[in-house]
């Protein structure tokens, strides 16, 4: 389960960041922000090599002592970043992929809302519920 989920706009500003309430939120803002360099690196590397454009999952961006940071990018260059506790060894790569697909589907639902202006912060109860289902339960 994730300890932080972030949606970052094409222009690299946060549309949505949510972390577990017991953790330091500023630390996760920093972690997500620093991971954007790795995301940009991977996107530019994918552009040079002819890769399947349907593969949106970037995989493990970088591990830290306490966390593992994973990335995903949409066709419109919106980035999803998920921070997972390193001690959770039972979480496999295909489970992370399915969590990102679920997040992407929920993001698509937000974008299809006629009252949502693209580029505005995401304020959707359905999106919040999707993210909550991916988060580590609060103790």
UniProtKB/Swiss-Prot annotation:
Its main location: cytoplasm. Signal peptide: none annotated. GO terms for cellular component: endoplasmic reticulum; Golgi apparatus; perinuclear region of cytoplasm. It is found in: Cytoplasm, Perinuclear region; Endoplasmic reticulum; Golgi apparatus. InterPro entries: Longin-like_dom_sf (IPR011012), Sedlin (IPR006722), TRAPPC2L (IPR044760). Keywords: Cytoplasm, Endoplasmic reticulum, ER-Golgi transport, Golgi apparatus, Transport. Belongs to the TRAPP small subunits family. Sedlin subfamily. May play a role in vesicular transport from endoplasmic reticulum to Golgi. This is Trafficking protein particle complex subunit 2-like protein. The lineage of its organism: Eukaryota, Metazoa, Chordata, Craniata, Vertebrata.
């Amino acid at each position: 389960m994730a300890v932080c989920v972030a949606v970052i706009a094409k222009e690299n500003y946060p549309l949505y960041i949510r972390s577990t309430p017991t953790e330091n939120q500023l630390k996760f803002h920093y972690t997500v922000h620093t991971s954007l360099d790795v995301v940009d690196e991977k996107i530019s590397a994918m552009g040079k090599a002819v890769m399947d454009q349907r593969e949106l999952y970037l995989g493990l961006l970088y591990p830290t002592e306490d966390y593992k940071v994973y990335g995903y990018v949409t066709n419109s260059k919106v980035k999803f970043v998920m921070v997972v506790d390193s001690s959770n060894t039972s979480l496999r790569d295909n489970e992370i992929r399915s969590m990102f697909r679920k997040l992407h589907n929920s993001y698509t639902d937000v974008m299809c809302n006629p009252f949502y202006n693209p580029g505005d912060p995401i304020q959707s109860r359905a999106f919040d519920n999707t993210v909550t289902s991916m988060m580590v339960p609060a103790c």
